[in-house]
């Protein structure tokens, strides 16, 4: 498994690779959100059913506009999300019609976050788009907290490990329904 810095990982992602990378709280698994084959590989590695959907992380909201149907959100709903970003808040937002079922699962919405983590920001800026994100663990197990755990659990299953440090968060992000304001998962 290649171990690379964020600036060196772009080609692997754009060629359909699945990567592990540090986030605010845990290591994540990620891939190109526009490549269904890569998303299916990520789901297989994690042993996660596609119906559950995935999260997109981005360096700014502009990167999410290809996936989120902002016309279904009020100015107040968007302002609330913007007041929490960048940061450890994931918002469930309506999707555009073309979004892959492997991203949104069985829902008509998608979970999105503008990350404050420098490494995630660098990855998304290098790609000029968001990154699929899910915790680096097999379904039902604890997420990886170290590069050593990634190497032990995912060697031969993913294409690269992004070097870097975890952020300061010790809990997963809070998930909020952007339309109703309801907290779906209490995080940090």
Swiss-Prot record:
Write out the GO cellular component annotations: cytoplasm
The record's similarity note reads: Belongs to the SUA5 family. TsaC subfamily.
Gene3D superfamilies from the UniProt entry: DHBP synthase
Q: What is the designated name of this protein?
A: Threonylcarbamoyl-AMP synthase
Keywords assigned by UniProt, alphabetized: ATP-binding, Cytoplasm, Nucleotide-binding, Nucleotidyltransferase, Transferase, tRNA processing
- Gene transcribed to yield this protein: tsaC
Subcellular location as annotated: Cytoplasm
| Catalysis performed (reactions) | L-threonine + hydrogencarbonate + ATP = L-threonylcarbamoyladenylate + diphosphate + H2O
| First-tier enzyme category under EC | transferase
Tell me the function of this protein.
Answer: Required for the formation of a threonylcarbamoyl group on adenosine at position 37 (t(6)A37) in tRNAs that read codons beginning with adenine. Catalyzes the conversion of L-threonine, HCO(3)(-)/CO(2) and ATP to give threonylcarbamoyl-AMP (TC-AMP) as the acyladenylate intermediate, with the release of diphosphate.
Supply the SUPFAM superfamilies for this chain. Answer: YrdC/RibB
Record's signal peptide: none
GO terms of molecular function: ATP binding; double-stranded RNA binding; L-threonylcarbamoyladenylate synthase; tRNA binding
Provide the YrdC-like domain boundaries: 3-188
Q: What is its EC number?
A: 2.7.7.87
GO terms for biological process? Answer: regulation of translational fidelity; tRNA threonylcarbamoyladenosine modification
């Amino acid at each position: 498994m290649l171990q690379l810095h964020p600036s060196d990982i772009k080609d692997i992602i754009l060629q359909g690779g699945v990567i592990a990378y540090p986030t605010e709280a845990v290591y994540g698994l990620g891939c190109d959100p526009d490549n269904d084959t890569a998303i299916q590989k990520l789901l297989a590695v994690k042993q996660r059913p596609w119906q559950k959907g995935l999260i997109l992380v981005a360096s700014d909201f502009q990167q999410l506009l290809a996936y989120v149907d902002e016309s279904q959100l009020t100015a107040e709903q968007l302002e609330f999300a913007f007041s929490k970003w960048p940061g450890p808040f994931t918002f469930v937002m309506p999707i555009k019609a073309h979004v892959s079922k492997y991203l949104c699962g069985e829902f008509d919405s998608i979970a999105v976050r503008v990350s404050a983590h420098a490494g995630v920001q660098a990855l998304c800026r290098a790609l000029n788009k968001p990154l699929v994100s899910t915790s680096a663990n097999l379904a039902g197990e604890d997420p990886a907290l170290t590069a050593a755990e990634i190497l032990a659990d995912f060697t031969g299953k993913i294409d690269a490990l992004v070097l870097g440090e975890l952020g300061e968060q010790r809990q997963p992000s809070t998930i909020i329904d952007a339309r109703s304001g309801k907290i779906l998962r209490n995080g940090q």
